[in-house]
């Protein structure tokens, strides 16, 4: 699909409808302001306004929970403890200030806005042990994957906002096809470590990922037939989507940049009232399954002012696969 998409899209997944809105700009109005102001005008079908989350004024800073910038010390517990604290208090905002922050998986909870200040860079660790294997859904089918860097399940009134950047460390997860790289890129990648298949066409981040690829290509072998202990040895094969929002309501992603995702970047599944505004996604053009946004089985979704430069599809509309669709 298109590598870069910068349009106003208005989606009702209840009827799987999609329409681009028109905008009448005034001399003093920017394109983004025009889109936001006029998004509900001239829609060719009946569509309720997408509800956005609202948060109490209460605010905490991850530094207050022991987070240290610099990219050397894990801030996983500090960030998640800040989120839990705000959630238990009834809601508010967790601020990630400017700086380099190294972390494992972040779990969003109801009534919490995770807000990144300008010049905040959140880098997710490439240590596979930090990402437990869970039951989830990917590419339209239920199955096991590693926990996503950012996730929410059965949450309501949640957001990720601000001007910060999230780096998913996807280069440590994704396989790479030789045909998608220059000779210089390929040679540098192979020299960096990892494993190459017997045909010399695909690079894998470790021996476990290659083993899983060979195993899954055999007739009669299914993911369900492989034990959790076996998957632990092949964990890199179970690369997660970067942002997994499941069965949640009133979700806002705004202003932030996501890059270098292990698989799909943003995957809302079975959500209602989702707004994605002014979000940027950057993945290398050779990234395997590097979709920017996959909206699956959702209802009332508004996407505006976004820039997606992805290694695969920019925006996909999905509703499961086969019997699960």
Residue ranges and their predicted role:
Residues 2-17, 21-95, 100-113, 117-254, ...:
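Extracellular "leader-to-stem" segments immediately downstream of a signal peptide or signal-anchor
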Residues 97, 269, 318:
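Conserved residues at the C-terminal ends of beta-strands
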């Amino acid at each position: 699909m298109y590598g870069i998409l910068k349009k106003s899209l208005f989606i009702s997944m209840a009827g799987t409808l999609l329409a681009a809105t028109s905008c009448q700009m005034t001399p003093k109005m920017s394109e983004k302001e025009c889109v936001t102001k006029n998004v509900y005008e001239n829609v060719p079908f009946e569509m309720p306004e997408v509800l956005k989350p609202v948060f109490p004024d209460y605010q905490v800073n991850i530094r207050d929970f022991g987070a240290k910038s610099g990219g050397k010390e894990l801030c996983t517990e500090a960030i998640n403890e800040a989120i839990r604290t705000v959630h238990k208090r009834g809601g508010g905002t967790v601020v990630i200030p400017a700086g380099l922050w190294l972390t494992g998986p972040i779990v969003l909870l109801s009534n919490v806005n995770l807000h990144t200040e300008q010049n905040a860079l959140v880098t997710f660790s490439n240590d596979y042990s930090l990402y437990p294997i869970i039951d989830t859904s990917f590419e339209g089918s239920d199955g096991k994957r590693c926990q996503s860097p950012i996730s929410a399940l059965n949450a309501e009134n949640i957001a990720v906002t601000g001007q910060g950047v999230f780096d998913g460390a996807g280069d440590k997860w994704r396989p790479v096809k030789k045909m998608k790289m220059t000779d210089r890129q390929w040679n540098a990648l192979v020299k960096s470590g990892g494993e190459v298949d017997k045909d010399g066409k695909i690079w894998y981040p470790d021996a476990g990922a290659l083993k899983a690829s060979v195993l899954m290509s055999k007739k009669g072998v299914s993911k369900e037939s492989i034990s959790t202990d076996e998957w632990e040895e092949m964990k890199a094969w179970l690369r997660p989507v970067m942002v997994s929002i499941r069965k949640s309501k009133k979700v806002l992603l705004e202003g932030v940049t996501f890059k270098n995702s292990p698989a799909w970047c943003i995957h809302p599944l079975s959500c209602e009232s989702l707004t994605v505004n002014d979000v940027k996604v950057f993945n290398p053009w050779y990234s395997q399954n590097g979709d920017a946004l996959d909206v699956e089985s959702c209802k009332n979704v508004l996407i505006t002012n976004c820039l997606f430069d992805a290694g695969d599809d920019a925006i996909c509309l999905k509703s499961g696969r086969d019997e699960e669709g």
